[in-house]
Regions:
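Conserved SAM-binding loop
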Residues: 1-53, 63-80, 151-157
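Short glycine/proline- and charge-enriched loop/turn segments
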Residues: 50-60, 103-108
Length: 157
């Protein structure tokens, strides 16, 4: 049995995520943590950026991605399977750059630039003692179903 199980960028690839989570439940110790990180698809920034730039749903990627989650759908899925979500966070909403007019989907060079801006944003806050602000920012984004990734930390009820 384990104190913690992590699924980082895994759940969206599984043919039967419910079966997999139920199997994981069998190997968790009491009060163990299940940590999951998935892409936050179909969020408002993503779909608006798609519409503004006339893009296809570039994030739909079969056969690699079989499941698509938002914060709400991930939390509902886990609660249905007997988990209580203790913490929910997101990551930087890269799709925001699309709304700024930077179409990184069409131009890979812009993608690298947007990534560097995101890294600089986080580094500047951390270097200036604002780590708690950054954490609260990402939790607030998760509550709005925004952010590139959604991370949850949960326990069995």
């Amino acid at each position: 049995k384990f104190d913690m199980v992590t699924l980082f960028n895994v759940l969206e690839h599984l043919a039967d995520p419910e079966r997999s989570i139920n199997q994981i439940k069998e190997i968790l110790k009491p009060n163990a943590i299940l940590a999951i990180d998935v892409p936050n698809e179909f969020n408002d920034f993503q779909t608006t950026g798609r519409d503004v730039h006339g893009l296809n749903d570039w994030w739909i990627a079969p056969p690699n991605h079989l499941n698509y989650f938002s914060k709400d759908s991930l939390v509902n899925f886990l609660e249905t399977l007997g988990f209580s979500v203790e913490i929910c966070e997101s990551s930087f909403p890269l799709e925001m750059f699309l709304l700024f007019g930077e179409n990184y989907v069409k131009d890979g060079k812009l993608g690298s630039q947007c990534h560097r801006k995101r890294v600089l944003f986080e580094e500047n806050l951390r270097k200036n003692g604002k780590t708690e602000t950054l954490k609260n920012f990402y939790r607030a984004l998760a509550n709005l179903n925004l952010g590139r990734q959604i991370s949850v930390f949960c326990k069995l009820k």
